[in-house]
Amino acid sequence: MTTSQRTAAILVAAGRGLRAGAGGPKQYRTIGGRTVIHRALAAFAEHPEVAVVQPVVNPDDIDVFNAAVAGLRHEAPARGGATRQASVLAGLEALVPHKPEIVLIHDAARPFVTPAVISRAIIAANKTGAAIPVAPVTDTIKEVGASGDITATPERAKLRIAQTPQTFRFDTILEAHRRAAREGLTEFTDDAAIAEWAGLTVATFEGDVANMKLTTPEDFVREEARLAASLGDIRTGTGYDVHAFGEGDHVWLCGLRVPHTKGFLAHSDGDVGLHALVDAILGALADGDIGSHFPPSDMKWKGASSDQFLKYAIERVAARGGRVANLEVTMICERPKIGPLRDQMRARIAEISGVDISRIAVKATTSERLGFTGREEGIAATASATIRLPWGA
């Protein structure tokens, strides 16, 4: 049996996380263009040595969870409990049929865990049976009494910041959690504490100072700034598309079904606005064009809705650790009139792409009755996309 077949991961995502503000659980907030939970889950789902990824979520969050992690590999979510400890036990019980030898337990609120930390966790578990990642303490720590006066100054050299994923042999941590539940002990703050209580020796391995837990609004502000600073490779791409009119009573423009006296002659739905945007994004990535990814010779795309093309292009940006800074599309036509639909089109592009509407522009012009657009034989669109990538992505 290979290491990957023996290793499972639990992603604990059932907390409400209200201290982070924004009116909802912090794991579903967006940071750097992706949800916190998508970043955390992807780290394990994309790791070659992790065979099973078991999320644990609040029952009220199933729909938002599924939307946030669409496309990522994971098991059906286990139902979270009233405490983190109960949620971890639910995740462990859900893994029993998989019979893993090693389990990594990770908090969804730590979205910046790296493949290197995950690999070190697996090595540590196989070597010691129980281990946690730690980071050095750089500040001086004080113990304070009820009066607010300092009572002691711990020796900093002996202190470490505990992180996740905390990693264990599956059978031993499962039994420790079951035993704690039977005895009504519910106040353990992490899995290492349960392991210590159960008599296990818990080793440590090198964590990562960037693997921090997002807790407060200030944490989100700081990490957004850090991510933005890391995306220094700024790229711009342009796109162009045109479709002739044919028979019909509507056209698709920027994701909207627009009534018209004609329709488009096209392999897909003919949405020139979205097609131009897709080409602009792919151009910024130096990743071909819409025809190379969705060839018109492939009947799979016959009549296809163009929103899936735009989603795909956005996913290509995210896959390289980037984010979209701006999208702009200009429609060139006499009719239908774009002005009254401008804000609806911006909103629809934002909905499809996940890009904030403040970063989306829709414009329109005519060709002054010149050329095929002036003769109302079709519609053209030009687009530009500005994206930010990490250097070397």
From Swiss-Prot:
One GO term of the biological process aspect: terpenoid biosynthetic process
Keyword Nucleotidyltransferase in annotation: yes
The keyword DNA damage appears for this protein: no
Keyword terms, alphabetized: Isoprene biosynthesis, Lyase, Metal-binding, Multifunctional enzyme, Nucleotidyltransferase, Transferase
Pathway stated in the Swiss-Prot or TrEMBL entry: Isoprenoid biosynthesis; isopentenyl diphosphate biosynthesis via DXP pathway; isopentenyl diphosphate from 1-deoxy-D-xylulose 5-phosphate: step 2/6; Isoprenoid biosynthesis; isopentenyl diphosphate biosynthesis via DXP pathway; isopentenyl diphosphate from 1-deoxy-D-xylulose 5-phosphate: step 4/6
Residues the UniProt record annotates as site (Transition state stabilizer): 19, 26, 267, 366
InterPro entries documented for this protein: IspD (IPR001228), IspD/F (IPR026596), IspD/TarI (IPR034683), ISPD_synthase_CS (IPR018294), MECDP_synthase (IPR003526), MECDP_synthase_CS (IPR020555), MECDP_synthase_sf (IPR036571), Nucleotide-diphossugar_trans (IPR029044)
Residues annotated as binding a divalent metal cation: 241, 243, 275
Recorded family membership: In the N-terminal section; belongs to the IspD/TarI cytidylyltransferase family. IspD subfamily. In the C-terminal section; belongs to the IspF family.
Descriptive protein name: Bifunctional enzyme IspD/IspF
Organism: Bradyrhizobium sp. (strain ORS 278)
Gene of this entry: ispDF
